[in-house]
């Protein structure tokens, strides 16, 4: 190893790198930078140190790369609760319009929309209709000398939709009687619907402290198939089913029953055992969720269903200058003509468009309800006569129109599903620190030693550079003061046995 001569004493001293290697806590380098000539031992230590450093860099880069891949893991847990908030329950009759409530004015404006009349306001296929229904329709569709009146889609749906007061035969919540006043009217694509436990209008949310049947909502409904519209054509409003559509959801999200609801058939008692799930997703770059606090144009709380309805509303308003009755906002409601000619085709086009137009990301916090359905036939042979007498209906009518819906928590617990970061900064630092200790015996303080050595080295170089500049300036000044004096340097031949700087000073004095 190179040794440098001491400027003051002329002796050999170790270089700065040798001093650092001898005092540093970095393993191995003291065996590389030692006093004396280059040996095989020093070469082997150098190879071992460089190899260990290379392995450290490879492993550390792999850990850094894994960190920036932003992986996540999912944690599932089940939590027992003392009580649970009962979910909102939205139900809709699959028939959106009661035939008996249709008026001549309704048929004049909306007969084509309902597929009851053609473009000429004529019954298209009278041979497909029941004679009694056909006669009633002909009377309602007699437009001879008729003067049409003003028409409102909101008023039409509210008046013609099924009334829960007429549909409901009985209602119980946790064994206590409830009624139509405990339901809130909402409008969906099915028309006039009803929501239980909405929490709106200042009503407190209902809770339950037990699981199992009898501790939730039990309701008996008459779907009134006699009121279903006759079908001899197909439109977006046409339905071939009989029953109700039901959606179980949280109070913070609007119903999207046409896509997320399940059907309940007449002639059966349907049991719905549900379990609450609380999901937590990660935002970018670990996930794709959107904060629930980031509201939308028409909804204060973000959810996927709210985003879908919000997007559809904006699209219809932009293209048709109106909105459907179930859509929020202050734009005017679409007329039946706008419904048929613009709004319904626009929704069809929107469904066919690239999904990026209505890109609805998952909210970061979401509550949903798992469901398990089972059903039994009603009425039984032994109860048929009793129900006939109680509701003054025939057994056939009961089998075709009456259903019972029983919704309850399977158990008084909820499931949490949470996304967590698979690799955080603390884990990254721990892995890199462990590998530093394994491969080169270094720690954070060792890194500080390296920075301190680099700082001292730079400072020394700068001071040497500044010292040389000052020395050159001083030498030039002394030479200028001696220009007028004779040069005696040639006459001096003796040797001065003093340090180099002292000797130079003496020579300059003699020279001057």
Curated annotation (Swiss-Prot):
GO cellular component, as recorded: dendritic spine; membrane; neuron projection; neuronal cell body; plasma membrane; postsynaptic density membrane; synapse
Designated name of the protein: Acid-sensing ion channel 2
Impact noted for substituting residue 67 to N: No effect on N-glycosylation
Recorded consequence of changing residue 430 to V: Constitutive activation causing cell death. Activated at lower pH
Effect of residue 4 to N: No effect on N-glycosylation
Protein family (similarity comment): Belongs to the amiloride-sensitive sodium channel (TC 1.A.6) family. ASIC2 subfamily.
Result after altering residue 414 to N: Increases N-glycosylation
UniProt topological domain (Extracellular) ranges: 59-427
Superkingdom field: Eukaryota
Positions glycosylated per UniProt: 365, 392
Gene name of this polypeptide: Asic2
């Amino acid at each position: 190893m190179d040794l440098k001569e001491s400027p003051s004493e002329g002796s050999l001293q170790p270089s700065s790198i040798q001093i650092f290697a001898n005092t540093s806590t970095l393993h191995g380098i003291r065996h590389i930078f030692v006093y004396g000539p280059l040996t095989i031992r020093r070469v082997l230590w150098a190879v071992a140190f460089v190899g260990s450093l290379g392995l450290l860099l490879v492993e550390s880069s792999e850990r850094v790369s894994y960190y920036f891949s932003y992986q996540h893991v999912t944690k599932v847990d089940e939590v027992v609760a003392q009580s649970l908030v009962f979910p909102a329950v939205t139900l809709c009759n699959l028939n959106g319009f009661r035939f008996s409530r249709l008026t001549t004015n309704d048929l004049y404006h909306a007969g084509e929309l309902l597929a009851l009349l053609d473009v000429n306001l004529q019954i298209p296929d009278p041979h497909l209709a029941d004679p009694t229904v056909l006669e009633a329709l002909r009377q309602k569709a007699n437009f001879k000398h008729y003067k049409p009146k003003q028409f409102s889609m909101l008023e039409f749906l509210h008046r013609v939709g099924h009334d829960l007061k007429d549909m409901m035969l009985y209602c119980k919540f946790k064994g206590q009687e409830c009624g139509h006043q405990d339901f809130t009217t909402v409008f969906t694509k099915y028309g006039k619907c009803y929501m239980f436990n909405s929490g709106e209008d200042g009503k407190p949310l209902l809770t339950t402290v037990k699981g199992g049947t009898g501790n939730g909502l039990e309701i008996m409904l008459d779907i009134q198939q006699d009121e279903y519209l006759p079908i001899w054509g197909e439109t977006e409003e046409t339905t071939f089913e009989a029953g109700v559509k039901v959606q179980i959801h949280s109070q913070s999200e609007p119903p999207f029953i046409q896509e997320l609801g399940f059907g309940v058939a007449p002639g059966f008692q349907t049991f719905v055992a549900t379990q609450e799930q609380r999901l937590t997703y990660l935002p970018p770059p670990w996930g794709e969720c959107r904060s629930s606090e980031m509201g939308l144009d028409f909804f204060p709380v973000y959810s996927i269903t709210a985003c879908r309805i919000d997007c559809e509303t904006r699209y219809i308003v932009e293209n048709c200058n109106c909105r459907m009755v179930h859509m929020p906002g202050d734009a005017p409601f679409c007329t039946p003509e706008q419904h048929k000619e613009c709004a319904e085709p626009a929704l069809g086009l929107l469904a066919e468009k690239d999904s990026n137009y209505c890109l609805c990301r998952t909210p970061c916090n979401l509550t949903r309800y798992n469901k398990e359905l089972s059903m039994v036939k009603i009425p039984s042979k032994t109860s048929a006569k009793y129900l006939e007498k109680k509701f003054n209906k025939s057994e056939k009518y009961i089998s075709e129109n009456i259903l019972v819906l029983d919704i309850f928590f399977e158990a008084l617990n909820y499931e949490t599903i949470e996304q967590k970061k698979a690799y955080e900064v603390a884990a990254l630092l721990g892995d890199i620190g462990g590998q530093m200790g394994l491969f080169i015996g270094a720690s954070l303080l060792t890194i500080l030693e390296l920075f301190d050595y680099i700082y001292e080295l730079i400072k020394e170089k700068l001071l040497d550079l500044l010292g040389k500049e000052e020395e050159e300036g001083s030498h030039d000044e002394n030479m200028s003061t001696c220009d007028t004096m004779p040069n005696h340097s040639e006459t001096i031949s003796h040797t001065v046995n003093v340090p180099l700087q002292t000797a130079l000073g003496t020579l300059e004095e003699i020279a001057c």
